[in-house]
Amino acid sequence: MTESEAGGLCTDILACVDLARRANQLAGSLTLLDRKRLELARALATCPRVLLLDEIAGGLTEHEASALVNTIQSVRAQNVAIVWIEHVVHALLACVQRLVVLNFGALIAQGEPHAVMASPEVQRVYMGIEV
């Protein structure tokens, strides 16, 4: 890859993760949301086919998590498959096509996200609600 091609790739990746406007800022000066976007950009620089996201929405406000979901959807639009481990359920429900719920490593539900969340076992284990 030439220097020019690498620069173009970086520009494209920063645009994909909504960081183009911050391209000249130091990482330490970025907000938590933008640091998470930067982590995505670093991973995308390797041109992966699959990304594993582990609790990426942790620590974000609901508004920030929503903005991160938009960023993740942009990444998915680049034909990158995403495996996402997360406890911020509203972020998952806004983004995923399929949800798998584990409890101590055991599968308790899988399928369409809203149907999975309505499952009595998921309600009991994760919400403490007896249905």
Predicted features along the sequence, with ranges:
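Glycine-rich phosphate-binding loops of nucleotide-dependent enzymes
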Residues: M1-V131
